[in-house]
Structures are given as C-alpha cells and as structure tokens.
Amino acid sequence: MGIEVCVKAASGAPDVLGDCPFGQRILLTLEDKKLPYKTHLIDVSLKPDWFLAISPKGKLPLVKFDEDENWVADSDLIVGIIEEKYPEPSLVTFPPEFASVGSKIIGAFVMFLTSKDHANDGSDMALLDELEALDHHLKTHVGPFVAGDKVTVVDLSLAPKLYHLETTLGHFMDWCVPESLTNVRDYMKVLFSLESFEKTKAAKEYLIASWAPKLDV
C-alpha cells in the first residue's frame, strides 16, 4: 500500500485536515519529496478503535512506510526515516547547526498565547527575543530559507509553527510580528506561498476553533 499517515482531523469536521503543526510537518516533508501517501484523518474527540489498537496512547502523527512495517510516532523520528529511506531530493539542513534555528519560537509563542499576565510575566518579550534571533539569522545569511536558497527540514518544521503563531495571536490578541522584523515577515510569506504548504495547511477557522478551548474563550 505504500506510505500511510495518520494525522489530526479538524475540530468539528472529521473529514477535513486538522491543525496539528507536527502532522503538517510530516505532510510537508512527503510533499516536498514528491512521495505518494495515503492520509487517515483521526477525530481526536472520538478516536476509532482501529487507531487505538495501533496507538493506545492516541499519539499523532503516525506513519507506516510499508504494509509489513510498524507505525512510527514522533515527528523528528519520522522525518529522519523519510530522509534516510528517500534521500532525493535532499532536505537535510546544512550546516547542521542551522537545524536548531528558531527551535525555541514554539515554546515562547505558546507561553505568550496562554499567559494570564503577559504584560508582567515577560512572555511577550521572550517571544520577541526569539523572533529577533530568527530575524538576525535571516538577515546575516543568504536566503530566502534558513540554510540558503533551498527549503530544508528546518523550514518545514518552522512553517506550521509560524502559521499557528500568526493566526492565533492575530485572532485572540490582535498581535502580529512587528514590522521592524522585515526578514521574519518576508520569510513567512515565502513559506506560506509554497505549493506544499498551501496543500497541507489547515483552514484558519479550524485552527482557531482548536485553540479556543485551551484559552477558555
């Protein structure tokens, strides 16, 4: 049957692709590798028995690379296996130290979004610091991507997270990436215009619907 992928379905719409950034990262990788795959959308509010049989803890995303292989969890591990099994075209980030660029943005973003007192707890400045670090990297290295003129795994990891950041902070907090961070803003435009991103992104309304319960709104 080839590659199969289990990813989150949209909140309230079990037949529509959901908002999980880690699931989108896997789909982006498969798309940019031009690999055929079958998608299973999993309603996390009503997980099917067959899914719980292969993932008792309900972990997503999951990938199976062949019919006689086991399902694999953890997006880092999955991306590594994809690169190992299907090395062309290469998505390896080089030099290796660039692979961690922007890695702290997701944590800072979630802390800021869920903060009850961001004006005083420093979560706003923590996020700004991480975005400024990304902006500095993009400004001082040839782009438009983190490691040069070609998209690599670090970009495919950052793209869904920056999409969540832009969508949720804009909707719930009327906040956006400062205009002074021109390199980050341009980088986001490039990422969001990728054909693979357009094909694998969740609609903004489903992303917002998924975050709302976590924010008590």
From Swiss-Prot:
SUPFAM superfamilies: GST C-terminal domain-like, Thioredoxin-like. The keyword Oxidoreductase applies. One of its GO terms (biological process) is ascorbate glutathione cycle. InterPro entries: DHAR1/2/3/4 (IPR044627), Glutathione-S-Trfase_C-like (IPR010987), Glutathione-S-Trfase_C_sf (IPR036282), Glutathione_S-Trfase (IPR040079), Glutathione_S-Trfase_N (IPR004045), Thioredoxin-like_sf (IPR036249). GO terms for molecular function: glutathione dehydrogenase (ascorbate) activity; glutathione transferase activity. It catalyses: RX + glutathione = an S-substituted glutathione + a halide anion + H(+); L-dehydroascorbate + 2 glutathione = glutathione disulfide + L-ascorbate. Its EC number is 2.5.1.18, 1.8.5.1. The keyword Cytoplasm applies. Keywords: Cytoplasm, Detoxification, Oxidoreductase, Transferase. GO terms for cellular component: cytosol. It is found in: Cytoplasm, Cytosol. Exhibits glutathione-dependent thiol transferase and dehydroascorbate (DHA) reductase activities. Belongs to the GST superfamily. DHAR family. This is Probable glutathione S-transferase DHAR4. It comes from Arabidopsis thaliana. The gene is DHAR4.
